[in-house]
Amino acid sequence: MKALDQLTFDNRFARLGDAFSTQVLPEPIADPRLVVASESAMALLDLDPAQAELPVFAELFSGHKLWEEADPRAMVYSGHQFGSYNPRLGDGRGLLLAEVLNDVGEHWDLHLKGAGQTPYSRMGDGRAVLRSSIREFLASEALHALGIATSRALCVIGSSTPVWRETRESAAMLTRLAQSHVRFGHFEYFYYTKQPEQQRVLIDHVLEQHYPECRDAEQPYLAMFRTIVERNAELIARWQAYGFCHGVMNTDNMSILGITFDFGPYAFLDDFDANFICNHSDDRGRYSYANQVPIAHWNLSALAQALTTVIEVEPLKEALGLFLPLYQAHYLDLMRRRLGLTTAEDDDMALVERLLQCMQRGGVDYSLFFRKLGEQPVAEALKVARDDFIDLAGFDAWGADYLARCRREPGNAEGRRERMHAVNPLYVLRNYLAQKAIEAAEAGDYSEVRRLHQVLTRPFEEQPGMQAYAERPPEWGKHLEISCSS
């Protein structure tokens, strides 16, 4: 493992030039202190976890110090926000500090969020608050532990620097890791500003660095787009299967790698509600839980439009046509596993849909239902789960069909509990748990953030003394309004 001064840098994106980003130095925050760090994220950089306790760690990730090899850059891009095109966005408070090359040949972006004003800040102050920084840290690491593709969070650094949102809050900086920070909106920017040469440079960069397996295809650009469609189909299937709501699926928040990116007012479902809206600014429900599938397709269509400079329209349409069937296949596979099924039958999707309809009629905690279902043999588990449902007749009919379906599975029930517990988390990042940790951190106590982080890194394992993190949320905890303010 390495010390901070032993990291190897290779700043590939910065070398593309000033048409793609602007060099900006971070603006330090006062009295930097470590709030929380992820050992597993540090391992991606080959960093010794003990480095997080050193004063220089907080200094480097709060803008007070820079590596000599760093080349901090604010990236330019545009995007569709709530369906309307915004021609010039860019990193308004984030900087791509550098790209680290680890010992297995992987490049990881070090991205500092809350680093101060940039040419793309518009009217913003360039800062991030402690509240939103903790939320992104916890979500990144929780999704990773669930097996959902995501950017990672290295650390959160707190400060005494005041910032104003709805009230006075304190500034913080989050260091995000990803193998690329290129978004759908990067391609839209060069397309709509009619810069085909720069767009081709960017496309070639992404192809060479992130989709090398597509280089030898008959049509490399089309092969890359098709792979992006495939990755997003699997990503959204995992979101839906685990009840994750992103909240702000603008095209500038969509990663070219097909990973969860740019967390805002996200939430995991508590009681199942297909129409759940986690962003209180989304008054029309554009980014509701149920709409995430069609919106992902819409965003891919926006990306396809931006790529019409290098790919013919008809092949792009054909590639887009892969999204829904791929999504459905991934989603059904995940839901079969969540139900403990190891084989496929034609009526399995109908079985899943009927269950969700029963849940929708009220009162059923989405995550805990699947966990309970695997605790005991099927007939006994159904009796226990029944108490949570309002539509008892509907659930009884579903339960009878589910029991019959389980009896058609090959072999005996040996290992069913272990199989189901391996895919059905006991611990999920509920908004009220995050809020309690944030309130403690805002009072200067970081122990709850760190404890919650540790619990969420092992979501499928029962952890002694952590039962409180596996409970149904209190009523007040189910209806927390989360805004884009960060």
From Swiss-Prot:
Its cofactor is Mg(2+); Mn(2+). The active site is at D252 (proton acceptor). One of its GO terms (molecular function) is AMPylase activity. Mg(2+) binds at N253, D262. Its EC number is 2.7.7.-, 2.7.7.108. Nucleotidyltransferase involved in the post-translational modification of proteins. It can catalyze the addition of adenosine monophosphate (AMP) or uridine monophosphate (UMP) to a protein, resulting in modifications known as AMPylation and UMPylation. This is Protein nucleotidyltransferase YdiU. It comes from Pseudomonas putida (strain ATCC 700007 / DSM 6899 / JCM 31910 / BCRC 17059 / LMG 24140 / F1).
